[in-house]
A protein has these predicted regions:
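Binding-site signature for planar aromatic cofactors or substrates
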Residues: 1-222
Length: 222
């Protein structure tokens, strides 16, 4: 495991290691489509605060622990209108954090369609989702720029690897754990809507920097 400094930032490094500047939307995380819905449903204040408070520029120790203990993650890729979401599994530790905002994972024997890797060759922007379904309610979303590594020596050091995928991570975002079921305990999320439509409030909505800026129609607004 690579120990990384903790801390939060409103800016993240790009694929070349340089900090990514905000786009025309005034955000490095949100585009105009996100902004349109935030404004329509009175969510911009919350979105901006979460970006500033929760989006990180480098992995914190808890991020590294979740990633390197994960037996699987979900990978999203897209190119030329072909959008794909793939399950990637392996022994815990098969995803390795290799830098403050960089990781690698092996590509194992598959079905020869190369849907994910083919998309990466055409468009390196990817999304990764790590979730713990064991009752801890942990979720981590990553965005980054992926590239294929075909160094025979490095590949030979990882049992079963056909090649490696390196990801320069641009967005590290620990996401709200609501709705994640406890599969180990066969228990549904405690935050699912009740028969009367009410829901338990998540902890984050009560934080001092969030509770007073919730959208006007938020069911947990005080």
């Amino acid at each position: 495991m690579v120990a990384m400094p903790s801390g939060e930032s409103a800016r993240s490094p790009g694929a070349d290691g340089a900090a990514r500047e905000p786009a025309a939307s005034g955000s490095a995380l949100f585009h105009d489509g996100n902004r349109a819905l935030q404004d329509r449903f009175d969510g911009r204040r919350v979105a901006d605060t979460l970006e500033a408070r929760r989006r990180a520029a480098a992995f914190a120790p808890e991020h590294v622990a979740l990633i390197e203990a994960a037996p699987f993650f979900f990978l999203a890729t897209a190119a030329e209108g072909a959008v794909d979401c793939s399950f990637k599994g392996g022994p815990p530790g098969f995803v390795r954090v290799t830098g403050p905002a960089e990781l690698e994972f092996p590509d194992y024997d598959g079905n020869s369609m190369y849907l994910s890797l083919g998309n990466i060759l055409k468009s390196p922007s990817i999304g990764m989702l790590f979730i713990a379904f064991d009752g801890r309610s942990l979720r981590l979303r990553l965005r980054g720029q992926a590239s294929l590594v075909e160094d025979p020596v490095r590949i030979a050091a990882i049992p079963g690897a056909r090649r490696l995928v390196r990801v320069a991570v641009t967005d590290i975002f620990p996401n709200c754990p609501r709705y994640i079921p406890d599969l180990a305990g066969s228990a549904p999320s405690a935050y699912l809507p009740r028969p009367d439509g009410s829901q338990r409030a998540p902890e984050w909505k009560g934080r001092d920097y969030i509770r007073d800026i919730l959208p006007r129609d938020d069911p947990h607004r005080v």
